[in-house]
C-alpha cells in the first residue's frame, strides 16, 4: 500500500498504550513523525506550538478501538525534521497536506488544538469529501482582541515579534520552553513530561518553528497573513454539515468569550461541551474528561 513505502519504523513512547507503533512519513525530502494504533476510519490528532504528538498520549490510549488513531509531530516539532525554512502558516500547511496525501487518508475525524486547528481546518475546507468529523479546543481559529488576553502575554508577544529580540529569547536563550511554556498550566508539569517537550529542541537552529508560533498568532489583526489564512476555513465552517465538537475550558486562553460567541453563531452543526479547568495545553490537564467526551461523541456520530 502507498503508506508503507520508504517509512522509517520507530518505537513510540509507552504512554501511547500497548500496540501503538511509530514511523516517519516522507514529505518533500523530510520526515513527519507519526504514532499509530488500530485500524479502520482514521482519527487524526494535530498539536500546536511548541508541543508534539506526546501531548495526545493520555487521550490517544483511552480511545483505542475507535479506529485508526494517528498522532503527528508537525514539521519543526517533536521527532519530525526541523528544516531551516520560513515557518509561515502556508509553508507548514504544505507538509500537513503532504502527510495526509502520503497516507491517502479519507473519512477522517480530526482532533485539533492550537495551530493544529488552523492546519486541520484549512485542510478540511479544501478536502471536504475526505472529512468525517472535527473536534477542536483551544484553537488558533480567528483574530484575537488583545483586550481578551493577559497584558503580560500581549507585552511578551510584542517583544518576540521584534527582529533580533525574539531570536535571542526563543532560539539562543531557550526561554520560551523554560519560562513561558511552563506558565501555561494550572498545575506544574512533572519534570519528566517537561523534558519530553524540551528535549527535541537542543539547539538554537532547532527552535525556529517555536519562534514562529507567537509571531504568527493573530492579535488585533496582525499579522494580516494569518488572518487571511484562517479566513479560508470560515466558509466551510459556516456551510458544512460535518459534525463538529468544541470543548471549552476555564479559564482557557485562545478560546476567548468573543471567539466562543462567534463560533456559536457562525459554525454549522456545532456541539459545545464544557470540559473543566484548564488553560491551553489542556490535554495535560484534563485528559480523562477530554477522552470521555470524545469517546461519547465518536460513538454518537458513528450511529448517525
Curated annotation (Swiss-Prot):
It is an enzyme of class 3 (hydrolase). The keyword Hydrolase applies. The active site is at residues 114, 138, 280. It holds the Pfam family Abhydrolase_1. Residues 42-154 form the AB hydrolase-1 domain. InterPro entries: AB_hydrolase_1, AB_hydrolase_fold, Haloalkane_dehalogenase_2. GO terms for molecular function: haloalkane dehalogenase activity. Its EC number is 3.8.1.5. Keywords: Hydrolase, Plasmid. It catalyses: 1-haloalkane + H2O = a halide anion + a primary alcohol + H(+). The keyword Hydrolase applies. Monomer. Belongs to the haloalkane dehalogenase family. Type 2 subfamily. Catalyzes hydrolytic cleavage of carbon-halogen bonds in halogenated aliphatic compounds, leading to the formation of the corresponding primary alcohols, halide ions and protons. This is Haloalkane dehalogenase. It comes from Agrobacterium fabrum (strain C58 / ATCC 33970).
